[in-house]
């Protein structure tokens, strides 16, 4: 795996890091189970374990570096995965408003090393309900997804595949109460990034 990454570094320096991670199957399964049985709110966030210590160097006998390639500089590592937090439009950004938005699940995780996911939205049409919120089934909610790039939009209900659409927008109608969340995939990316999630949303809870 390391040599695959080294080989692809020159042409695809950012995508090279995709050799070292995969869809977090076990974590997502545990999260889905925790938010479904019984239905309860549990917010997903993500961050980077950045050390800038992956690379190749050639030193002389005195230990002086002759050639060095840093594969994971901090400016690249900190773009691998991000938590995008949604705060009310026009409100002042503060520590308190940031923590409140995160605690409410008004956020989503994205692998921005693939593409900047700013502008993603998962909400209920004709309402103020966004990811992290709940809504009653008898209100006949329509779930709406918007992405900044054309993508494969997958909706997951209670941890199971519910449906998918292609494009920058998608609409899904819940078939019952449950925990609904979104995963988005950039299928046009080459391996090893192909098949890896680009965006993982927090759920909307339909009661």
What are these regions (language model features)?
Residues 16-21, 86-88:
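Second-shell loop/turn segments in exported
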Residues 21, 25, 96-99:
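Non-membrane alpha-helical structural segments and their capping/turn regions in soluble enzymes
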Residues 36-207:
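C-terminal functional module detector
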